[in-house]
């Protein structure tokens, strides 16, 4: 008997592509229902049938909800009329997609990237709201019947225990987007040469500079280190807070910052490898959820990490496990400055942290996708 599976994810990126490809190895017919598919270094297998739905629109809260709802209705009709003989793998985008399992009676698994109804608290829907209470009941019923409930971190797994027995929860960590990432010495790094950074000790932040990213504390750290002209804070990316941080740097008369916009993906191996220390930030609201995807790219280039996150975060657990950096609370700016100075003064310590990052990277490769099947 043929094994058929349809996977559902409104916004598909490299992680989902790798997961779908893992299913394609073991299943006869594989379909992907998606609104958008972001280009990845690894392409979808030729045997995968792509079935398009409405693209997820992040531009406003109303558009998010409308595209979620419309996408869910499209998924329902496709499952009823096109995929009657298919096992189903739901991803929580749209968040309500797996609720269709109430009406679509066939084997299913659920991949939990965002936990609902818990995420509804961000818009004021709390445990006392009827929608919240009803969703809790749905979760307990549907999770119990699922073949697999898969999530991204131990912290998220702990939250899911409110809805399903821990034995049914499988934690699978994410992985790097690229196979091309590896350490590149500064002397052989064209990105370093282009920006004349050969003699700099580089503190790198690469990523979004939004309201939830505590990048501005790097300005306070730089104040402590202003007397060392060899230390450079390299900020790569864009976001709502970038201009504010540039203003802070200007007002403090700091010359130790270089701001660059997003770099071409071909530059990524070189820009990440430029880091003597790589910075990752998490706010309190997201600390328990998962490890930022950029972490795995930084591990692959052997970057020592300086994490600005709560000590009970998933990121802190990773760093403590692999001993490849240190985590600090956001107000520990002086301690972070001391940490940077220590790594600059003791290259042997930085070298050990770098080796530990490379060792950790071996646990976070796209082969992890095989665990989903």
Ranges and model annotations:
Residues 236-237, 243-269:
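Nucleotide-activated donor-binding/catalytic signature segment of Leloir-type glycosyltransferases, i.e.
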Residues 155, 172-175:
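Carbohydrate-associated surface elements
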Residues 1-46, 225, 368:
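N-terminal subdomain of nucleotide-sugar transferases
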Residues 200, 335-338, 342, 349-363:
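A short, well-ordered alpha-helix in the C-terminal region of glycosyltransferases
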Residues 14-17, 70-75, 80, 87-119:
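An aromatic- and histidine-rich active-site surface loop
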Residues 213, 262-271, 278-299, 304-317:
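Nucleotide-sugar-dependent
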Residues 196-213, 219-222, 234, 354:
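Conserved donor-binding/catalytic core segment of Leloir-type glycosyltransferases
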Residues 80-83, 98-99, 103, 116, ...:
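Membrane-proximal helix-turn-helix segments that form the acceptor-binding/catalytic region
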């Amino acid at each position: 008997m043929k094994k058929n599976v349809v996977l559902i994810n409104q916004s598909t990126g490299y992680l989902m592509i790798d997961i779908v490809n893992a299913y394609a190895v073991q299943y006869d017919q594989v379909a992907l229902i998606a609104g958008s598919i972001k280009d990845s270094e690894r392409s979808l297998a030729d045997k995968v049938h792509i079935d398009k739905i409405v693209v997820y629109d992040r531009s406003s809260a109303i558009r998010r909800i409308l595209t979620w709802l419309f996408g869910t209705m499209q998924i329902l009709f496709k499952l009823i009329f096109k995929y009657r003989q298919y096992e189903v793998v739901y991803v929580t985008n749209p968040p309500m997609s797996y609720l269709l399992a109430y009406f679509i009676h066939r084997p299913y698994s659920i991949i939990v990237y965002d936990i609902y109804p818990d995420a509804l608290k961000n818009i004021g829907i709390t445990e006392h709201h009827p929608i919240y209470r009803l969703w809790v009941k749905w979760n307990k019923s549907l999770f119990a019947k699922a073949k697999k409930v898969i999530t991204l971190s131990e912290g998220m797994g702990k939250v899911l225990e409110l809805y399903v027995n821990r034995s049914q929860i499988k934690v699978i960590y994410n992985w790097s987007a690229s196979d091309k990432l590896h350490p590149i010495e500064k002397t052989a790094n064209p990105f370093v040469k282009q920006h004349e950074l050969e003699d700099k000790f580089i503190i790198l932040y690469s990523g979004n500079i939004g309201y939830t990213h505590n990048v501005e504390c790097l300005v306070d750290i730089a104040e402590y280190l202003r007397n060392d002209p060899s230390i450079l804070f390299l900020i790569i990316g864009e976001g709502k807070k970038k201009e504010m941080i540039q203003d802070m740097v200007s007002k403090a008369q700091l010359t130790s910052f270089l701001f660059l916009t997003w770099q071409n993906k071909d530059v990524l191996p070189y820009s990440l490898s430029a880091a003597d220390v790589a910075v990752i930030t998490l706010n309190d609201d997201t600390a328990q959820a998962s490890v930022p995807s950029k972490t795995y790219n930084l591990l692959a280039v052997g970057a020592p990490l300086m994490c600005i996150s709560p000590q009970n975060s998933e990121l802190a657990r990773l760093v403590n496990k692999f001993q490849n950096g240190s985590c600090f609370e956001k107000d520990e700016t002086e301690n972070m400055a001391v940490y940077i100075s220590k790594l600059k003064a003791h290259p042997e310590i930085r070298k050990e942290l770098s080796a530990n990052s490379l060792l950790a990277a071996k646990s976070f490769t796209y082969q992890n996708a095989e665990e989903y099947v």
